[in-house]
Amino acid sequence: VNHALPGEGLAAPAANYALAIVSDAPSRLLHTSGIVPITPDGTVPASMADQADVVWSSILLLLTEADMTPADIVSITTYVVADHADELPVVMAARDRYLGGHRAASTLVTVPRLVRPEWLMEVAVVAAAG
């Protein structure tokens, strides 16, 4: 079972995420690589919204393959190309939509660029299930 710590005495999170998650003796852990916005046919959508959908739908497929759900995600690391930092609300909205109200520990970092110039974002998650 995973649950958020309230962070007594700390500032509230800046968005819909948890400051820390405790996993009570998980029997299985899933660590993804950075998931990038490449569709199964090898294309990369142009818009940030479409890239976020590709990334998060890929993460959901991996969770399903591991017999897990979004509620099992304990940590999210998101990288967004700095030139597109004005689209962070789009990235965060996609995350929230795919998590369905679940809050995980989350770090969002802007970077000068990713490996391929058409990639605008990349997400890695850790999930724990009992």
Map each language-model feature to its residues:
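N-terminal presequence-like segments and the immediate start of the first folded domain
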Residues: 1-74, 80-130
